């Protein structure tokens, strides 16, 4: 049996302000730092250890991984960063307040933008200063690979090649793997691993900073999955994520 640990980054400044974040590179709040440290303490207390870590190129996930590994005295572990683990791109909504958008467009429309599988938000214009196409961290990519908006279907298509080419082979080779990423890149992995339907994935929410453990069989098919720590607290945190887009 293999294990995979997934951690959504701790609370970010724009989580706190209830803004659509996407690829905008905001930092952790003090609460987010503490959530990341607590994840590390919890993993250490439960006897977890790792050989290899993966994260995105966005600082809220990277720093979550740092703090988690620091609490485990594993800051020396090899870490692979990939843009493919970035958050879903929220297009023209990036930087806007979710509740304000719900008041303007209605809860149902914001839910579609936030959680629907195949409906992206309005796209950024390529010349919009919020676009990441001129960001040096994506300089090795073809501009067409740097999105101007994404739906979850797009995020799944972006994340799965990295799973298939990097993460899954590492697990199958016997490496103990932790992934620190984002709500929607983790939802993309959850959808794939659990075979969740396009409709059902709308109801899946991932709380900040709580380790999600997958136990996998020899073919990397899930045996079971669970959040470490207080299950009730994890459920409440996931419900709070679900409520962010309401007026």
Swiss-Prot record:
**EC nos:** 5.4.2.11
The organism named in the record is Delftia acidovorans (strain DSM 14801 / SPH-1)
Q: Which NCBIfam families does the record associate with it? A: pgm_1 (TIGR01258), PRK14115.1 (NF010713)
Instruction: Name the enzyme's class.
Output: isomerase
Supply the alphabetized keyword list.
Gluconeogenesis, Glycolysis, Isomerase
List of residues binding substrate: 8-15, 21-22, 60, 87-90, 98, 114-115, 183-184
Q: What is this protein called?
A: 2,3-bisphosphoglycerate-dependent phosphoglycerate mutase
Keyword Isomerase appears in the UniProt entry: yes
User: What PANTHER family would the database entry show?
Assistant: PHOSPHOGLYCERATE MUTASE
What positions does UniProt annotate as the active site of this protein?
9, 87
Catalytic reactions of this protein: (2R)-2-phosphoglycerate = (2R)-3-phosphoglycerate
Where exactly is the site Transition state stabilizer? 182
Q: What does this protein do?
A: Catalyzes the interconversion of 2-phosphoglycerate and 3-phosphoglycerate.
Recorded name of the encoding gene? gpmA
Q: Which family does it belong to?
A: Belongs to the phosphoglycerate mutase family. BPG-dependent PGAM subfamily.
Question: Any keyword Signal?
Answer: no
């Amino acid at each position: 049996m293999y294990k995979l640990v997934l951690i959504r980054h701790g609370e970010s400044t724009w989580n706190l302000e209830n803004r659509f974040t996407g690829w905008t590179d905001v930092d952790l709040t003090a609460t987010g730092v503490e959530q990341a440290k607590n994840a590390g303490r919890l993993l250490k207390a439960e006897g977890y250890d790792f050989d290899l870590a993966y994260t995105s190129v966005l600082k809220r996930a990277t720093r979550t991984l740092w703090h988690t590994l620091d609490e485990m005295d594993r800051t020396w572990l090899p870490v692979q960063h990939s843009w493919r683990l970035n958050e879903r791109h929220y297009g023209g909504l990036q930087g806007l307040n979710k509740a304000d958008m719900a008041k303007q467009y209605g809860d149902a429309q914001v839910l579609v933008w936030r959680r629907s599988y195949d409906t992206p938000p309005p796209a950024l214009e390529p010349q919009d200063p919020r676009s990441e196409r001129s960001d040096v961290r994506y300089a090795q990519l073809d501009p067409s690979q740097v999105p101007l908006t994404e739906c979850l279907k797009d995020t799944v298509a972006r994340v799965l090649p990295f799973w298939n080419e990097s993460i899954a082979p590492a697990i199958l080779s016997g490496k103990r793997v932790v992934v620190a990423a984002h709500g929607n890149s983790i939802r993309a992995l959850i959808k794939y691993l659990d075979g969740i339907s396009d409709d059902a994935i709308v109801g899946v929410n991932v709380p900040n900073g709580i380790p999600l453990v997958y136990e996998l069989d020899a073919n990397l098919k899930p045996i079971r999955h669970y959040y470490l720590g207080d299950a009730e607290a994890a459920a409440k945190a996931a419900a709070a994520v679900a409520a962010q887009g309401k007026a």
